[in-house]
Amino acid sequence: MRLLIDINVLLDVALQRPGAAASARLLALCGRRHEGWLAWHSVATLAYLIERQQSAISGRDFIRSMLVWADVAKTGRPDALAALDLPMHDFEDALQVAAAMACGAQFIITRNERDFKASPVPALNPEAFLRRYPEPSPPADS
């Protein structure tokens, strides 16, 4: 399944915020079972926020570790114009939706589901996604 990961889920893990355990489990699944995608603008914002809390090195190291399993949605002017027309209050959230649409994501994984009520791509928080799509148990040894 293709998932667009909102920056707040990444920050849970990077800054060890509440919800970090579920967010980390979800990100681990992106490396194995699901395709994880990021919006282009999230990469710069993520670096800035981590560097402000920790250091430039830790911000870049975290992004490098994300780019091992995550791809970056390819967006351009038509996507930005489409985001302007979405019935959403927060333009940054509209850009996330445009990125999700550009990469063909089935879900946006976010801590702020309510901000995506008008999104054509459904949004779930990490815990809800993990409940809905649990990781299969390993086969029992015979």
Model regions and ranges:
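Active-site neighborhoods of divalent-metal-dependent phosphate/nucleic-acid chemistry enzymes
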Residues: 71-113, 140-142
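Short acidic, glycine/proline-enriched helix-loop-strand junctions
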Residues: 57-80, 115-142
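A residue-level structural signature of the nucleotidyltransferase/glycosyltransferase Rossmann-like core
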Residues: 2, 35, 72, 108, ...
